[in-house]
Amino acid sequence: MTTNSRLCPSSPSSSLIKHLTTSGGPSTSLTIMLSVIAIRILPAGMRNWIRQALGSLLFASFLLLSSFHYPITLTLVPVYHESLVKPTSASFGGIRLSQLTMIMERRATPTCQDPSLTEV
């Protein structure tokens, strides 16, 4: 009896961990962690324009990565949303961050096979 071996990942986080440990991604996660720390320790006056610049850079990176590695896009957009910016004031070029998250989730959703389908 043969079963389908290709099932959906249990969560975006597990996919991200798998991706980071297999494809040289720790530098990406380290960069984002340092960015979060840097923004939190900056004076309030500098935070706004640096946050906007960093947001634009991350947005461009996410768009680029989304065509290659969907788990990193799916996971890091919400992390950026919760860590760096207020949900009510965040936008990238007129696109609200919550909308961006939904767009990326829709784009990044993998096609999954039904686990109940098995070959006998």
UniProtKB/Swiss-Prot annotation:
Record-given protein name: Putative uncharacterized protein YJR038C
Taxon lineage: Eukaryota, Fungi, Dikarya, Ascomycota, Saccharomycotina
UniProt-annotated location(s): Membrane
Main location: membrane
Residues spanning the membrane: 26-46, 57-77
GO annotations of cellular component type: membrane
Keyword check for Transmembrane: yes
UniProt entry keywords in alphabetical sequence: Membrane, Transmembrane, Transmembrane helix
Protein's membrane topology: Multi-pass membrane protein
